[in-house]
């Protein structure tokens, strides 16, 4: 990143929107951090108002800081040509025009990207992917997202949704026989809600990802199987991505990636087992090098590239 003025970073998610002012060297100004709710049932006008309110709060908290640009990372899908977002968990916000929502707040450009692209940018800037020219970041949480860095640059694709790995299909074994193989999206199989739902069909009586983590630590057989099932699916998807894109490294982030201490190791083993070619097996699978500020750092990195 070249020297530049601070930027406003905005991260739009399915339950909340975060905003903060971030310096050119990656310092999130703590006084500026702001959060507002979004939510599936929130009206479109309310979502737009809360996005803008979070941005305004962040800016007004540091009135002496000159902000040069805005970077926005959003849950997908996004539409970069239309400059709009349509987060799957915010049906009321389909086609929300970002320039209208955030226009006029700063005297500078507004950059938009998929949240997965922003996470990849953040990992490449200050996290686990520093120095990797061809890499991917994957977030395993209530959903599964991802972003790509190829040739040292973020890849957006035609609409802005390159790297949206969660909606690709994987083949997972739910039992011991070939007849138990099913095809499903990576997100349905590997994300926290899907893993919890599957465990409950197997007789597990917990309710949340935190419950599943506790059961895993206690050695509960179903919880162990659910974690293994999730990690195997993520590993299969990584093997496909590494084969297609010749990746050097993949960073795993997201709350559900902490469901077990050995989750990333399980993903790495599954990726190696599913890779046909040696070059794909050489792809390193590593934990995220970021803290909870990762999405904001990614949105800031996006703005700083402008």
Model-derived segments and spans:
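Hydrophobic "anchor" residues
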Residues: 28, 84-85, 154-155
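Short clusters of small/polar residues that mark proteolytic maturation junctions
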Residues: 33-35, 89-90, 159-160, 170
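ATP-binding/phosphotransfer module of carbohydrate and carboxylate kinases, centering on a glycine-rich
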Residues: 1-69, 78-82, 100-110, 122-132, ...
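A charged helix-plus-loop insertion that forms the helical arch/lid used to bind
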Residues: 83-95
